[in-house]
Every structure is written in structure tokens, then in C-alpha cells.
């Protein structure tokens, strides 16, 4: 199973929407720039029928170096989380049911 890349998305826009290749690549880049910009300004990103990207603050917690067993603190940080929407969940579940 492969991975969907930004280049793949641009190619689909080129083939299905009729944009030229440069415009298609720019549109994909612009989309991801908007998502990054919104998240960097602490905004939630809601994509109807797909899901939501949220920011979550994680507190500092104790961790352990797997090689030495030494306890080390894992610093507090902000992470991006994704929660799939109902339509995406249903599509994935339907697809998973067709696998053998």
C-alpha cells in the first residue's frame, strides 16, 4: 500500500479539474499553507465531511531512556491532533470490510 503525496494531489487536480500542472501544485501548496497558518494562530481547522485538526497542550511528564533506564523529563509541548469526521469514519469502515 502506497502513500498519497502532495504531488499525487496536484496530479489529480491537473487530470480531473483541468488546472495546468503549475496551478495544481500551487493550489495544493496554498491549501496546506492555510491549514498550517490557522493552526499556528491557535485556530481549529474544520474540514466538513473529513475531520478536524486541533491543537492540544501536553503537560510535562516523566519519561525513561530506553537504553539506560534513566528517568528523564519529557517537556511540555503543543501537538496537533486529528479527529476524523463521521463520513470519513464510515468510508474507512466500509473499505476495511472489503479486505480479505
From Swiss-Prot:
Keyword Transcription carried by entry: yes
CDD domains membership: IHF_A
Xref: SMART domains: BHL (SM00411)
Intrachain S-S bonds: none
Keywords linked to the UniProt accession: DNA recombination, DNA-binding, Transcription, Transcription regulation, Translation regulation
UniProt GO BP: DNA recombination; positive regulation of metabolic process; regulation of DNA-templated transcription; regulation of translation
Entry superkingdom: Bacteria
Entries under Gene3D superfamilies matching the protein: IHF-like DNA-binding proteins (4.10.520.10)
Description of how the protein assembles with itself and partners: Heterodimer of an alpha and a beta chain.
Family recorded in the similarity comment: Belongs to the bacterial histone-like protein family.
Entry-linked NCBIfam families: himA, PRK00285.1
Protein name: Integration host factor subunit alpha
Source organism (scientific name): Hahella chejuensis (strain KCTC 2396)
